[in-house]
C-alpha cells in the first residue's frame, strides 16, 4: 500500500509537467505502419474460446406432468435462479445451492401434456368431474408415494400409446398448452443476461415406442418472439408423432416459417432396447436410406452421453477389453421395463458403438448420421440441476435427500423395481464458446465443440492434426496453436500434408478446482477396416505416478484414498493437470476413424457415501460407495481422401 501511495502521489505532483515531455499520441496510420496486420494486445481480435462454459441441456420443472406428479412445485423461474447460484428451497424443504453457478441452462419440460399438471394441481373442473381425472388428481394432491404412483401410472400409459382418460390429455393448440408454453418462454427471456448467463428456450419431445426410449430435447437459438410462433411438437396424433423423422420435419418447418434455428439432442439410448441407433432399419422396419442419414446428421449434432438414468458411453458387453466400460450402467430393460434387456440390443444403444456404426453407414449411404458431439446433463425432474456427488437432489422430488432414499423404490413397473441408490449423480455439458450468449453457445453445439462430464468440472482441450509438438503443448498459447495447426474436438482432420505418416493429438486436462485429482487421460479410437468391420482401441496416453503398463498393456489402478465412513478423500495421489501429444501408432490412411479423449479422476466418494455419512442412510450392500468421475470429449474424425 505504501508503494502504491507514493507512485500515485508522484503522478499527481508531476503529471502536468511530465506530460509535456511525452511524444504526441500516434495516429492510427502510424500505428498500422509500426504493427502491420497485428495488434499489440494479444487478446484483440482473438475469437477463440478461452474457457469452457458449463451448463445443463436437460432440466425439468413442475411444468412437466411427471415432475409435478412426483411432487415438484418449483417452476422455471426457480430453476434459473438456482442455476445462477442463488439459494432455493427444494420441494421437500431443504435449502439448496450449487457449489458454483452454471453459465447456461436449458429448461426442457415435456411437450406432451404441457399444462396438464397445472390443471391437476388447480383441481380444474374438467379434471375433477372425470372419474379417472379425479382419481389421479387426488393421488397427486396426497403426495408422497401416492404422487409417485400416479406419475408412474401416467408414464406407463403414455409409453403404451394410451391415455387414462381424455380429460388427462392436453393437446398442442389448446389454451392450457399455449398458456404454459408462453410462460416457459417468458421465464427464459427474463433470465437471459448475455455475457453473464444464458437461458435457452427448449422442450423435450418424449417419444416412447412400445416402451423404448426415443426422447429428444429441442433447443432454440432464438428469442421468445420466434419460439412462440409455433407450438412445440408432441407425440400425440393427429398433429404429433412418435417417429423422429416427423420431429425433423417439424424442425425444418419451424426454421422455414420463423427463419430461426433449432437442434435436437437424443438421450438414454440405454433405455431404447436397441432402437436409438439403428444400422439397417428403423424401429418400424423402414430401411435406412440417404434421406434418413442426411436428415439425422442435419438436426442432431450432439448426443447426451451421461445423465441420472445411466452412463451411455459404452457397455462391458460391447467393450470387454475396457476396464472403465462398466460405469453406472443402467440397462435392465426399456424405459417402462415392459421388455427386459437382451445382449443383441446393446449395439443400438451406446455412443461408442454408434460412432462405429456411423462409419459403416457413411460408407454405404454417403453420410454419417451418428457424427455427434457428446454432452452430459442431469434430466433432473426437481428443477435443480445438481450433478455433484456431495450435492445431489435426485431424479425427482420423491427421491430428494432423505435417510431412506438409497433403498427406496424410485420407479417400479410390474415386478421390476429401480432403487434409489441406482440413480446417477450425472452429468454436465461443457461448451467451448467465445461468448456467453445464445448464439455463441448454440453455434458451438452445432460445430460439436462440446464435451461431457459425469458432474465434475474437469477442463479438457483436445486437438487433432499432423504436426503438433510437445513445445506446442508447453507454450503459453497451446489453444491458439491447437486451432492454428489442426481441428478442435468435434472437427475433422485435414488431409495429410506431404510426408505425414500418422495424425497426432494434443490433449490437456485440468482438475476440477474442488474435485479429485486426475488419474489418467485416454484416447479412444474407433475405425473401419477394408472388409467393412469396425474395431476399437483404448490407449492410455498420459497418467499420474510411476506406474507401468503390464504385459497386456494395461495400466495398474491408481489406488484410492477414499474414507467411506467419513465421505472424504485426499488428493495425495493423482495430478492436478496433465497433457501430452500422442501419435496414433496403428494408423492406416485407408481406414476411416474417429478419436476422442476420456479423462478419468482418482476415486472419490459417491453420493451414497455422503447420504450414509450425513443422514445415517442405510445403503444396500450392492451399492457402490466410490466413483471415478470422468470427461468424454467430442470426437475428431478422419476420412480417407
Q: Where do the language-model regions lie?
A:
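C-terminal functional module detector
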Residues: 22-76, 80-83, 87-137, 170-173, ...
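Substrate-binding cleft of extracellular glycoside hydrolase catalytic domains
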Residues: 124-160
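Ser/Thr/Asn(+Pro)-rich, low-complexity disordered segments
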Residues: 142, 243, 283-285
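Conserved, charged catalytic cores of large soluble enzymes
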Residues: 224, 234-236, 240, 325-328
